[in-house]
């Protein structure tokens, strides 16, 4: 389990990619992280390969996503950390060549962008919400994977 600290929290406030109000067209493998982002993609006809959700926004406002995912998995991931269970499930899901999967988080999904970048293949598009700004779209690259490895080393491991 990795625990968030102030130094890493400060780093994570900076988007890993470009912030959009409306996303451009997206091709290839897509992972969405967050309920509002996933709902936006689905309502625009974009079905992510994997959607990571907790059915809340801003920690406690319920979000209704009227979509039936093809495959659903659940894990626990407490606020402010990346649980071993979440890491292992994301690692596993990165090897599946399927679409319309959901990883339902009991807890909080905010930090799970980190293991997604670590384990999903290069050129995967990752979309997550940047509170009060829009959606961040990034393509996984080797350089980004190296940045994530550095962040993980700076987090407290338990």
UniProtKB/Swiss-Prot annotation:
Pathway: Cofactor biosynthesis; coenzyme A biosynthesis. Keywords: Coenzyme A biosynthesis, GTP-binding, Kinase, Nucleotide-binding, Transferase. Belongs to the GTP-dependent DPCK family. Its EC number is 2.7.1.237. Coiled coil: none annotated. This is GTP-dependent dephospho-CoA kinase. Catalyzes the GTP-dependent phosphorylation of the 3'-hydroxyl group of dephosphocoenzyme A to form coenzyme A (CoA). The lineage of its organism: Archaea, Methanobacteriati, Methanobacteriota, Methanomada group, Methanococci.
């Amino acid at each position: 389990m990795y625990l968030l600290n102030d130094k890493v929290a400060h780093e994570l406030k900076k988007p890993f990619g470009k912030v959009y109000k409306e996303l451009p067209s997206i091709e290839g493998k897509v992972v969405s992280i967050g309920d509002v982002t996933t709902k936006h993609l689905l309502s625009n006809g974009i079905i992510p390969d994997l959607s990571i959700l907790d059915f809340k926004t801003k920690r406690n406002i319920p979000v209704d996503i009227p979509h039936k995912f093809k495959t659903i998995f659940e894990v626990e991931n407490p606020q402010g950390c990346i649980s071993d269970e979440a890491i292992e499930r994301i690692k596993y899901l990165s090897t599946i060549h399927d679409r319309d999967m959901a990883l339902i988080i009991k807890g909080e999904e905010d930090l799970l962008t980190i293991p997604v970048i670590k384990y999903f293949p290069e050129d995967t598009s990752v979309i997550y919400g940047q509170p009060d700004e829009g959606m961040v779209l990034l393509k996984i690259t080797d350089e980004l994977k190296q940045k994530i490895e550095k962040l993980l080393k700076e987090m407290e491991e338990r």
